[in-house]
Swiss-Prot record:
Disulfide bonds join 26-38, 32-50, 37-78, 60-86, 80-96. GO terms for molecular function: G protein-coupled receptor binding; growth factor activity. Highly expressed in liver and ovary and weakly expressed in testis and placenta. Expressed in mucosa and mesenchyme of embryonic gut during enteric nervous system development (at protein level). Predominantly expressed in kidney and liver. Also expressed in lung, ovary, placenta and testis. In fetal liver, is restricted to and highly expressed in hepatocytes. In adult kidney, expression is restricted to the endothelial tubule cells. In placenta, expressed throughout gestation. GO terms for biological process: angiogenesis; cell population proliferation; circadian rhythm; positive regulation of cell division; positive regulation of MAPK cascade; positive regulation of vascular endothelial cell proliferation; regulation of angiogenesis; vascular endothelial cell proliferation. Its main location: secreted. Residues 1-19 form the signal peptide. This is Prokineticin-1. Keywords: Angiogenesis, Disulfide bond, Growth factor, Mitogen, Secreted, Signal. Belongs to the AVIT (prokineticin) family. InterPro entries: Prokineticin, Prokineticin_domain.
Length: 105
């Protein structure tokens, strides 16, 4: 009987150690800090995380450009940083790229 109790306790400890603490979880953009948005996680279904705005060369979604977005964002990427545009490249993907129309040369 005593051996069964020890096994039960060991099983409880083993299952309790397989957990993770997730920081930066959010529901909407207003819960995130400056320079971030609340985007869907690629790794955990149903989880949204405060994610940095897109930097030059990073993938983006052309329909995801408003900050703060008042509802739940449906994309895993944030809009591009303010000085960048979400542009389509020859390979068909969208990436953050400098807005050359507004550049000061």
């Amino acid at each position: 009987m005593r051996g069964a109790v020890h096994i039960f306790i060991m099983l409880l400890l083993a299952t309790a150690s397989d957990c993770a603490v997730i920081t930066g979880a959010c529901e909407r953009d207003i819960q995130c800090g400056a320079g971030t948005c609340c985007a869907i996680s690629l790794w955990l279904r149903g989880l949204r995380l405060c994610t940095p705005l897109g930097r030059e060369g990073e993938e983006c979604h052309p329909g995801s450009h408003k900050i703060p977005f008042l509802r739940k964002r449906q994309h895993h990427t944030c809009p591009c940083s303010p000085s960048l545009l979400c542009s389509r490249f020859p390979d068909g993907r969208y990436r953050c790229f400098r807005d050359l129309k507004n550049a000061n040369f």
